[in-house]
Design a protein with these regions (language model features):
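Short, surface-exposed ligand- or partner-binding patches at beta-edge/loop junctions that are enriched
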Residues: 99
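Short, Lys/Arg-enriched N-terminal segments with co-localized hydrophobic residues
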Residues: 1-18
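Enrichment for repetitive, rod-forming helical segments
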Residues: 11, 26-27, 66, 112
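Structural scaffold elements adjacent to functional motifs in cytosolic proteins
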Residues: 55-57
């Protein structure tokens, strides 16, 4: 009888421990999902005031000829060496403001940068086409 109670207590302890790990996993996943933030023009401009922030334009060279956000660095998302170029130019501890033409490529670029270890990514939701 004592052995059975002991086994049941061990089982309950294991279940409790698994619940803790599951909660930690859920919290970690939530933080990862929201570490890339879509922002509107007003918020993007506020973030630009941070002197340590870096602005990354992921459009093609032809698109950049039409204009760009002042102070931005251009690395085309379609470049074979996209990630290595960004890593060479932008430290991973910096706030990175990312934009493309309409918001699609910048969202994909942010996913790739997040996987590479960038923590503070902000994606201009309307892209350069919606920039004022």
């Amino acid at each position: 009888m004592l052995n059975r109670i002991s086994n049941e207590l061990l089982l309950l302890n294991k279940i409790h421990t698994m619940q803790k790990y599951l909660l930690i996993l859920i919290l970690f996943t939530t933080v990862q999902v929201f570490s890339q933030t879509k922002v509107d023009n007003a918020r993007f401009k506020e973030l630009m005031l941070d002197s340590t922030a870096m602005i990354l334009d992921v459009r093609t060279a032809n698109e950049v000829q039409e204009g760009k956000i002042k102070g931005s660095i251009n690395v085309s998302y379609f470049a074979d060496n996209f990630l290595s170029e960004v890593e060479r130019m932008i430290p991973k501890d910096r706030v990175v403001l990312v934009y493309c033409a309409a918001g699609g490529r910048s969202a994909e670029a942010c996913k790739q940068l997040k996987k590479a270890g960038y923590k503070q990514l902000y994606d201009l939701q309307s892209g350069y086409n919606g920039w004022e």
